[in-house]
Amino acid sequence: MPNKRLMLLLLCIIILVAMIGFSLKGGRNTTWPEKVIGDTTGVFQNIFHTPAEFFAGIFENINDLKNTYKENERLREKLDGQTQYEAKLQELEEENKSLRDELGHVKSIKDYKPILATVIARSPDNWAKQVTINKGTQQNVAKDMAVTNEKGALIGKIKSSGLNNFTSAVQLLSDTDRNNRVATKISGKKGSKGYGLIEGYDKEKKRLKMTIIERKDKQDVKKGDLIETSGTGGVFPEGLTIGEVTDIESDSYGLTKVAYVKPAADLTDLNNVIVVNRDVPTVDTEEEGS
């Protein structure tokens, strides 16, 4: 029995080889067995080709999707880096502008020794009264030294009670303490108009209260007049900008005029400041004092 099966298998192989040989010869018609084999082969090729092509397309789409995802991730990282770069550039531009303003003010107070400092603390309970800066006695900061913002507008003076080796407390102009006085000079479009004395801060109006002490040639103090330090009190040097007059009233007795002054510095937003170091001893007087 095994021999018969082997003989049958060999016979089939011989017939198949013979048919292939005949099919390779040109110039003859295709036999029906060849047609059957060709049709059968074509059917199976068609059956397997379509799914194979379908799955090949799926794998190709998946590969394209992976490549697209990687490209999107790369572009997103690049965009994030660009955004961070732009934010850093904006920060540096603002810092550069602030430093330029400080430099310009330093040149304008060349008669004094400026000490550049940064506000490092501000208590919510004393928000309008004082700020803390990062310079102290080790950097030659002393009590009653005038302090300005980066544009040169007066914001206050160094408090003796808050003076340490490496930090200092600055008493702001917006402190309502009536002893927080500043001797002032009043100037209009045509020059000096007289002198005054800032004696406090009105929280409701958000203005400094200045008593008009002397008027030159009886000139009237008007809205828009410039108020600067006069330098006569022995604490604040002359010529520091304080603000401008926004309103004028008579006192409760009708004897003197009181001007309300809008500070030139934004006392609610302080960052970089300048301590004005004068080489003259400070003098405690009734006009200017702590």
From Swiss-Prot:
Primary location class: membrane
GO cellular component, one term: plasma membrane
Species the sequence originates in: Bacillus subtilis (strain 168)
Gene3D superfamilies: Rod shape-determining protein MreC, domain 1, Rod shape-determining protein MreC, domain 2, Single helix bin
Entry keywords, A to Z: Cell membrane, Cell shape, Coiled coil, Membrane, Signal
Cell location: Cell membrane; Cell septum; Membrane raft
Knocked-out gene: effects: Loss of viability. Cells lacking sufficient quantities of this protein undergo morphological changes, namely, swelling and twisting of the cells followed by cell lysis. A polymeric material accumulates at one side of the division septum of the cells and the presence of this material correlates with the bending of the cell. After prolonged depletion in the presence of MgCl(2), the cells become very short and fat and eventually spheroidal, but no significant lysis is observed. Addition of sucrose results in rounded cells. Cells are still capable of making division septa.
Name the UniProt record assigns to this protein: Cell shape-determining protein MreC
InterPro entries, sorted: Cell/Rod_1, Cell/Rod_MreC_2, MreC, MreC_beta-barrel_core
BP-aspect Gene Ontology terms: peptidoglycan-based cell wall biogenesis; regulation of cell shape
Subunit text: Self-associates. Interacts with MreD and proteins that belong to class A and class B high-molecular-weight penicillin-binding proteins (PBP2b, PBP1, PBP2a, PBP3, PBP4, PBP2c, PBP2d, PBPH and PBP4b).
Coiled coil, from the record: 58-111
